[in-house]
A protein has these predicted regions:
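Short Lys/Arg-enriched alpha/beta "domain-start" segment
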Residues: 1-40, 73, 82-136
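N-terminal leader/targeting peptides and immediately adjacent processing regions
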Residues: 2, 6, 21-22, 37, ...
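Amphipathic, interaction-prone secondary-structure segments
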Residues: 28-55, 140-164
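Intrinsically disordered, low-complexity regulatory segments enriched in Ser/Thr/Pro
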Residues: 49-75, 163-187
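Conserved aromatic-histidine-acidic binding/catalytic patches
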Residues: 65, 106, 117, 121, ...
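Conserved binding-pocket/active-site segment within a compact domain
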Residues: 123-183
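Conserved small/polar residues in nucleotide/adenosyl-binding loops
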Residues: 189-191
């Protein structure tokens, strides 16, 4: 008989589901006020999609009729619920990843794995990038050839700026976070 292997990410989500069930719900609502209780779930919007965390078993499900969440989406939600600090608030002070509290050691990896990929992926595809941000209910910004603010969560806005390549420069992208982002989630490298 062949043994079925379970991904470590799936195992981690299962652990987080159990951890969620032990969380003080009143405290959780104070730390993440955007949570709403509905039909046995705490609901939350993540990148424009509606999810529910089951109050019965701690699992996360799609509530918008689209595909079920993948492990990255689930871990983003679980870490927000687990690490958001009470009293955290949006400061409206925009900084690159490297300037977030305690993020500097991870900045080179973030640059290579996120910002550089963002720039390369959308080079020559400004129209598609605009359409993607619009699908995420993004708010257009005046900076860059394409600039939008979107929300990873209501409490965690992000700003994306893109400059198309030209005869002198390669395409450039930048992703800015509100300085308070690490008060809401310690694992921003995955968002």
């Amino acid at each position: 008989m062949k043994e079925e292997r379970i991904s470590n990410y799936v195992k981690l989500c299962e652990e987080w589901a159990q951890r969620f069930l032990k969380m003080d719900q009143a405290d959780l609502h104070k730390r993440v006020p955007e949570l709403k209780e509905e039909n046995g779930f705490l609901t939350i919007i993540h990148f424009g999609r509606r999810y529910g965390v089951s109050l019965e078993d701690g699992s996360i499900r799609s509530l918008d009729g689209q595909r079920e969440p993948d492990t990255t989406e689930m871990l983003n939600i679980y870490t927000l619920l687990g690490y958001a600090k009470e009293g955290a608030f949006i400061m409206d002070k925009w900084v690159p990843f490297a300037d977030l509290r305690n993020a500097r050691p991870f900045a080179p990896a973030y640059q290579i794995g996120e910002t550089d990929v963002f720039s390369a992926t959308f080079s020559g595809h400004e129209k598609e990038l605009r359409e993607a941000f619009q699908k995420l209910d993004g708010r257009e910004l005046p900076q860059g050839d394409v600039g939008y603010e979107i929300r990873a969560f209501d409490c965690m806005p992000m700003r994306f700026f893109f400059w198309e390549r030209d005869e002198e420069f390669e395409a450039q992208g930048n992703i800015l976070f509100d300085y308070s982002a690490t008060d809401f989630n310690l694992s921003l490298i995955h968002i």
